[in-house]
Amino acid sequence: MTTLPVQQLYIHGQRVDATSGKTFKTVNPATGEVIAEVQVASQADVERAVQSASEGQKVWAAMTAMERSRILRRAVEILRERNDELAHLETLDTGKALAETTTVDIVTGADVVEYYAGLATAIEGIQLPLRESSFFYTRREPLGVVAGIGAWNYPIQIAMWKSAPALAAGNAMVFKPSEVTPLTAIRLAEIYTEAGVPAGVFNVVQGPGREIGQWLTEHPVIEKISFTGGVATGKKVMASAASSSLKEVTMELGGKSPLVICDDADLDRAADIAVMANFFSSGQVCTNGTRVFVPRSMLAAFEAAVVERVKRIRIGDPMAAETNFGPLTSFPHMENVLRYIESGKAEGARLLTGGGRATEGALANGAYVLPTVFSDCRDDMTIVKEEIFGPVMSILAYDDEDEVVRRANDTTFGLAAGVVSKDISRAHRIIHRLEAGICWINTWGESPAEMPVGGYKESGVGRENGISTLGHYTRIKSVQVELGDYASVF
């Protein structure tokens, strides 16, 4: 039995039926029960969404920046008024603890919308004199219609991260949420409409990425793709975007991020950071610090401190106020994480805690995996090399700074990195040598609206959040003006 009615598409300011005649089911990962059936967009539906966006964008771009700013600020007010309602739906769909979704997902996403609402009026060009009778100026103009393709771990937050700068700059967006967690994107679209965003400026099309995502990346009207997901899919999106019409792309992809504990670090602080960097959101965070490098001299003490903290994690019904660790977001993903755990055991890593499903009582019905910590890990182990995207920490011993920097950088990923040390000069020195786009010293994981997010190497292209992102949703037009006579050479 489903909990919610059939979920439609959202095109031109209203919910509309898809024309494909197909649906898919979205499942509550805490119980295995179907939440809703979701309609799948056809190619004709995607075309309708793009054309609607093209029409709406012209209306939106013709407004003054101050008008757009006021409308986005009103959307922020509505988001905050409905925080608990949206958080409840997000928990139902993702399995994340309600204690997390009520304080992080909508709250921080709304912060990003508010941030870009404030910047909408600050988009400006330059003017420079060339000589007494001539000068040039530049204009930053919106790209037009852009597409956002979201991930399943932070559905509504990612939708806001992608749409806020796009809309602030005067663009329209066609957004495709993950088919694993599709429910809150339409609620966001309705809030934008209620706030006064013109019809068509934020449309939502549902369905599998291999179809909907491909149609969006190849569409000649779409000028930019913002994608969050895996590396392999990201490469396909980038190739498709380039082959169709040389679209600009922004990609936040995978990670296998190092957390370096220095020998002068406070043990309790280091253990607290390591546990947060691995088990927040049940380990389903792109920036997780899953490779924890610890000085050999403090390895035993660090292991004990981490295990002590893991035992305090409260696994349970994500709707319960006391729960701070819910199920993984889907059953197929749970099976994948369990395979990685078994590979860690088979390749000789020493299991300190966890190592399988949580099956006590009602937990057996959900996609629960115990917080898992391995030690005696080697750089060539599968659990150390590949992104697991689950609650699995790998502890690696090291002997000196040069060694740990070399090993930390020995990866195709470069999303995040962190250092824990009482010596701030030392921490800066190590951070500056690490090949990662998002770094933390003596903390982990916070991504404020003002801070650019993105990776090095195969972890991504471009950035989300921060001032510079706004520029990537505009294009520069240069205009020269001649005030004097024009002298032809002919």
Curated annotation (Swiss-Prot):
Catalytic reaction list: betaine aldehyde + NAD(+) + H2O = glycine betaine + NADH + 2 H(+)
Where does this protein act, in terms of pathway?
Amine and polyamine biosynthesis; betaine biosynthesis via choline pathway; betaine from betaine aldehyde: step 1/1
Could you tell me which residues carry Cysteine sulfenic acid (-SOH)? 286
Which cofactors does it use?
A: K(+)
Question: Which residues does the annotation say bind K(+) 2?
Answer: 246, 457, 460
According to the record, cofactor stoichiometry and binding are noted as:
Binds 2 potassium ions per subunit.
The record's annotation in SUPFAM superfamilies points to:
ALDH-like (SSF53720)
Name its GO BP terms in alphabetical order. glycine betaine biosynthetic process from choline
What EC class does the entry list?
oxidoreductase
Record: active site: 162 (charge relay system), 252 (proton acceptor), 286 (nucleophile), 464 (charge relay system)
A Pfam family matched in the record? Aldedh
Tell me the NCBIfam families matching this sequence.
BADH, PRK13252.1
Family classification: Belongs to the aldehyde dehydrogenase family.
What is its biological role? Involved in the biosynthesis of the osmoprotectant glycine betaine. Catalyzes the irreversible oxidation of betaine aldehyde to the corresponding acid.
What is this protein called in UniProt? Betaine aldehyde dehydrogenase
Which organism's genome codes for this protein? Stenotrophomonas maltophilia (strain K279a)
